[in-house]
Amino acid sequence: MAYSYTEKKRIRKDFSKLPDVMDVPYLLAIQLDSYREFLQQGVSKEQFRDIGLHAAFKSVFPIISYSGNAALEYVGYRLGEPAFDVKECVLRGVTFAVPLRVKVRLIIFDKESSNKAIKDIKEQEVYMGEIPLMTENGTFVINGTERVIVSQLHRSPGVFFDHDRGKTHSSGKLLYSARIIPYRGSWLDFEFDPKDAVFVRIDRRRKLPASVLLRALGYSTEEVLDAFYDTNVFHVKNESLSLELVPQRLRGEVAVLDIKDASGKVIVEQGRRITARHINQLDKAGIKELEVPLDYVIGRTTAKAIVHPATGEIIAECNTELTADLLAKMAKANVVRFETLYTNDIDCGPFISDTLKIDSTTNQLEALVEIYRMMRPGEPPTKDAAETLFNNLFFSAERYDLSAVGRMKFNRRIGRTEIEGSGVLSKEDIVAVLKTLVDIRNGKGIVDDIDHLGNRRVRCVGEMAENQFRVGLVRVERAVKERLSMAESEGLMPQDLINAKPVAAAVKEFFGSSQLSQFMDQNNPLSEITHKRRVSALGPGGLTRERAGFEVRDVHPTHYGRVCPIETPEGPNIGLINSLAAYARTNQYGFLESPYRVVKEGKVTDEIVFLSAIEEADHVIAQASATLNDKGELVDELVAVRHLNEFTVKAPEDVTLMDVSPKQVVSVAASLIPFLEHDDANRALMGSNMQRQAVPTLRADKPLVGTGMERNVARDSGVCVVARRGGVIDSVDASRIVVRVNDDEVETGEAGVDIYNLTKYTRSNQNTCINQRPLVSKGDQVARGDIMADGPSTDMGELALGQNMRVAFMPWNGFNFEDSICLSERVVQEDRFTTIHIQELTCVARDTKLGPEEISSDIPNVGEAALNKLDEAGIVYVGAEVGPGDILVGKVTPKGETQLTPEEKLLRAIFGEKASDVKDTSLRVPTGTKGTVIDVQVFTRDGVERDSRALAIEKQQLDEIRKDLNEEFRIVEGATFERLRSALVGAIAEGGAGLKKGTAITDEFLDGLERGQWFKLRMADDALNEQLEKAQAYISDRRQMLDDKFEDKKRKLQQGDDLAPGVLKIVKVYLAIRRRIQPGDKMAGRHGNKGVVSVIMPVEDMPHDANGTPVDIVLNPLGVPSRMNVGQILETHLGLAAKGLGEKINRMLEEQRKVAELRKFLAEIYNEIGGRQENLDEFSDNEILELAKNLKGGVPMATAVFDGAKETEIKAMLKLADLPESGQMRLFDGRTGNQFERPTTVGYMYMLKLNHLVDDKMHARSTGSYSLVTQQPLGGKAQFGGQRFGEMEVWALEAYGAAYTLQEMLTVKSDDVNGRTKMYKNIVDGDHRMEPGMPESFNVLIKEIRSLGIDIDLETE
């Protein structure tokens, strides 16, 4: 296999046995692909597909005026260029978006002509607001913050059949129902009631008999019965009836008389129940008619009206129950033939017939009126209104749309073969649904499972944005229709008709405040990726937490390979927010698909198919771990498979598909947990969730025991710098990498230079630090896709969320009681868990009524010492170390004239002092924060003079841009001249630049020539002359282009900023805060083993082994057995082996052993103990040495999920590292030097520091802000609040009779206003007495009682 630039430097020993059939797909594809389809950027108008924005426009346009004499048509749209790039948007706090310009055509028809002749056509581009762009990492920058739009899992449109699980009626009878759910429009429900009649509801309103809907559709009673029932035909013969016999219909009935065949042989005796055997005999005998007595038909229902043969008078309407009287009338009228409905109690119930009987309507109009009354109660119905309402409900494309998905699901469910069709319902659709419902009630067919992933689909960003856009367009449509009538007469242009505000507002609202548009979780690269791959059942059109039951939240068999069964939040959202499985993707309809290998006749092929939950149901799917021989044939006699959503075993020849990988079941976060298969599911859930909260440490440290997914996550998350094209590193420093691109990858006419600017010390959404460090050095060769710089939490292109710590599992003086963690001081000294947090503090100068606020260093009543970190503009220097209360930005606000004291008047008179009319409102460092200023940004409103600091910042930025562009030009020029040199050397010159005709050009000559002079050479070969001219033109073009670019950037920098109304200036100060680990911080492993640091012990007191190596962390062994996360123990053992092997390699390097020995030892590690084979022969000696140097700290291992290291392999690794195979060793007490009495498990575990830091939670208050009504202190750290002393705490003090404590808690410490001020004064004066008064909350109580109309007064003595 080929190794990438970083893989070569550090190979991870992989224990997986199964081959990689398929790489893990790009992890952010679900976001990027969806939005790309929505915008269709870079596609020409002619090639626009009917999706996304284009589809939204086509669904609303053309807009036709009310009179029909004018129309506005949509032609196409184009997207402009963004005003700022992503970084500038974040800095300025604006949205990263492009202007949308739509070309529309206004057509005015001639009113006079009969055939609508066109009178006038105007075409124009209209601005329709801004559309946010997605960044290349799948996020949106909205008002300067990065946001993610989470995909939504909602019920697919279509038709669903269900029952009430016997909960509605006390008898426990199952009441079946059907529901047609469109993509947009009214819901249509059919349901049975306990008496077995069928009812219909529209939009969950009052129910009507279902026959009302059928009548409204234009069906007569007879047509309805004809559609739903077969008929029995009876012929009248004298005193008896003859039935046209269909033998199957007799099954289960009791014979009323003997049934004989033609020869007179009795087939069924009278009184016997007719069985399947009897029916076969009747079929064989070929009996076509059966004599039955007259009373056989009493109680049956007529299928068609019975008419008097002579007079045409109706004797019995259709759907009438036959009685003896009716039979007598029929006999009298000589009716010879009539038909009844065929019903029975087993599989053909009389439900529709019964419904027709309770239906009061008789014709279509009555039915329409009935529906109108139900939809619009209290409005007088008219024929037209009723018809319009009914047609608009389900048959108008504007109001109702099943969508392509809905139509496909609908047709599949009712058994049609075609999957395409109209977006609106038809009469046949409604009848087909009713038929299916009746069939299910009759026992044919089954109800749907709504939690099946074939019935739930994913709505991604693009689709939600399109819906929102359509909502905006529909709002515009109304306004346009009204203005179109004016356009006919007044000659308006399209621009005057369309107001883009509603569209822009709808889009802005969606991206800014929709429930699914979330502030990106940016703790570390994994949390970013997971957030973008999240699938939520909540949100508009989805479920609500309160209504979601247990079934929706549960793991469903169809989740396999589509949605992770492990990763979901704990708490109220459990099961409603899920994560996409590693290999899952959505299909064109939005259903989740999982990949499988095709198996033919027991042989596994390399063909891969993606199947949705519906498509895979009939397949027999083997697991990825099924044993295969060399030919790829399944060898076991019985293979463990999934079939019809059940786990079972089948013979190899029955198998049709096979999983592609064992990790296709779990999500990205879960696939990063080594030995996941040994952890309990609940702990694995905590483990995957806590990895997302890990704070990037100062120096990232790759996990010694990983799973092999680390590289994919780091690469796809976008925090690393990945080479866009291969080439040679031309120059590299801490802030940028310049690559000279390989000739074969350079497109014609472009520079062939890629400049990568690195992100340095930037703030993330969670205030962690984003910083990139280059991995390459000058002259290195990189290929496309290689990782050139590490980001936060990545180490050589691998995800590195924490640190490898030497842990021992043993109790230690009670310091690790209840999951506490005992740390060694060495961890703090080595800055292993030191993290950098960046805080942004903002100071805003506004225009007030009394005059503008000013930012300056001239602040009243502030000493010199407080100002020594500010420059003359009043803004803190970059690099200043500041602490709580320090001034960062000096700001003064004018205050109203107050009454002056005589002293002030005197001062005023003497000095003309005006210091008193402003107050100090400077930006100060908040309490508990200490750090270094790393950056300052100043934004000034247009027309306000910029201060010296703003100008200095601008100059610095311009210098950087100029340096970048010069560098680019230098490389372009260099590359061009290199190509010229190779062409010119050895060629014959004609003259120019002081050369004689016929001289051959040499390298030395060119070196001595100024570059500008090269172009004066005249060559004998015309092609060379042409090349020289082209080169000269190319270089001057580039120069011009780069100058233009610089001017453009300069213009952007110098133009004023677009600030909120009333804001003159904004200063943003960025503080870098360094946090060491300390007691109270939360730490965790990757197996859900979390704890709080309880104590940091001196190194010399920690337990150590026989060599004197102390452990870093002591964990409590009692945390393992009851929690069943044994993965952490296996990780510890394998980690010990990894570290031991690293130490062994280090000793070999120190002893300067031969490279051959190193090579042999590395081959032993990588190729002799299980797992993947590594090709070390392709490494040169230098590369082997570099590899060995990188392995000194430990040989990283990969134990993939469900395909990891076996116990025997861990032991073999320990043996190879010369360590005890038990993984346990004798430890000594650091304080006494005594040996502990039994061996202890010691090894290396990967520990994370979570973003729950004690510094952020620590909080204390003496006095502060109070609530307005109750006068009690506010709550919470953000409000600088107090601790609530609630009713249960009051009971506790009452129980102990602590009267004085209780009194001060309820009065002076809380809401006795006078008492607390007096108390504060007393304490200041050193007098510790209190005088409690009346608590304010008592007054509130009195007011509340008075508001009930009860007069209450407190009588004071």
UniProtKB/Swiss-Prot annotation:
InterPro entries: DNA-dir_RNA_pol_bsu_ext_1_sf, DNA-dir_RNA_pol_bsu_external_1, DNA-dir_RNA_pol_su2, DNA-dir_RNAP_su2_dom, DNA-dir_RNAP_su2_hyb_sf, RNA_pol_bsu_bac, RNA_pol_bsu_CS, RNA_pol_bsu_protrusion. Its EC number is 2.7.7.6. The keyword Transport does not apply. One of its GO terms (molecular function) is DNA-directed RNA polymerase activity. GO terms for cellular component: DNA-directed RNA polymerase complex. Keywords: DNA-directed RNA polymerase, Nucleotidyltransferase, Transcription, Transferase. GO terms for biological process: DNA-templated transcription. It catalyses: RNA(n) + a ribonucleoside 5'-triphosphate = RNA(n+1) + diphosphate. Coiled coil: none annotated. HAMAP family: RNApol_bact_RpoB (MF_01321). DNA-dependent RNA polymerase catalyzes the transcription of DNA into RNA using the four ribonucleoside triphosphates as substrates. NCBIfam families: PRK00405.1, rpoB. Belongs to the RNA polymerase beta chain family. The RNAP catalytic core consists of 2 alpha, 1 beta, 1 beta' and 1 omega subunit. When a sigma factor is associated with the core the holoenzyme is formed, which can initiate transcription. This is DNA-directed RNA polymerase subunit beta. It comes from Ectopseudomonas mendocina (strain ymp).
